Amino acid sequence: MEEERRLRGRLSRRRPPAGGGPPNCRPWFLSEESKSEPWAALLRSTVGGNTDWTPNSQPLPPLPAFPSQESLPDPESTVPPEVFTVGSKTFSWTPFPPALRGSGSSCRLLRCPEGSPGSPAPSLKGCPALDSRQTPSTQECVQSQLVLLNCPLCQKAFDPKLTQLDVDSHLAQCLAESTEDVVW
């Protein structure tokens, strides 16, 4: 048993420094041998002249709020969930936030049937205008009858005479054959 202890070695506590005062706890990046290391130089520049690392130092002030958190209200608290019933079950659904103005990525893919299909910027006079603070209900979306101009996966142009079932069938087939992740 003693032989095992001798082979393992002994662990001992560090002795306090002579003089009885608190130990000199200088951070590693303030030591003389770390002057040339880039991380030490970066840390030294952030510390500046304040090298007081004792726990008795005053606490730091809280960080300021992020600018976008102050100006925007919480979207989840402003939009009430929609409730719908299918058969005997009732479901609640929280609608997506309204699209940001200036994000015209979906404008190129959708058009109203009244718009001219050959124009580069389709006319939306038959579609209801969306208020940026209001999400359209499901009934409004069905009544607006937006039509997909082309497939977002293969970019095939859809004939205006195609039914919604034909478009959905093509999208399902294209999505099934796709190996890429698509964000809708």
UniProtKB/Swiss-Prot annotation:
GO cellular component: chromatin; chromosome; Fanconi anaemia nuclear complex
GO biological process: DNA damage response; interstrand cross-link repair; translesion synthesis
Pfam families: FANCA_interact, UBZ_FAAP20
UniProt-recorded name of the protein: Fanconi anemia core complex-associated protein 20
Gene Ontology MF, one: zinc ion binding
Matches recorded under PANTHER family: FANCONI ANEMIA CORE COMPLEX-ASSOCIATED PROTEIN 20
Species of provenance: Rattus norvegicus (Rat)
Region (Disordered): 1-30, 46-81
Residues recorded as bearing Phosphoserine in the entry: 119
Metal-binding is among the record's keywords: yes
Zn finger (UBZ2-type) start-end: 148-184
Bias type Basic residues, positions: 7-16
Location of the protein in the cell: Nucleus; Chromosome
Free-text note on domains in this protein's UniProt record: The UBZ2-type zinc finger binds both 'Lys-48'- and 'Lys-63'-linked polyubiquitin with preference for 'Lys-63'-linked polyubiquitin.
Subunit structure: Component of the Fanconi anemia (FA) complex. Interacts with FANCA; interaction is direct. Interacts with REV1.
Biased composition (Polar residues): 47-57
Keywords, comma-separated and alphabetical: Chromosome, DNA damage, DNA repair, Metal-binding, Nucleus, Phosphoprotein, Zinc, Zinc-finger
Record: residues binding Zn(2+): 151, 154, 170, 174
The protein's role, per its UniProt record: Component of the Fanconi anemia (FA) complex required to recruit the FA complex to DNA interstrand cross-links (ICLs) and promote ICLs repair. Following DNA damage recognizes and binds 'Lys-63'-linked ubiquitin generated by RNF8 at ICLs and recruits other components of the FA complex. Promotes translesion synthesis via interaction with REV1.
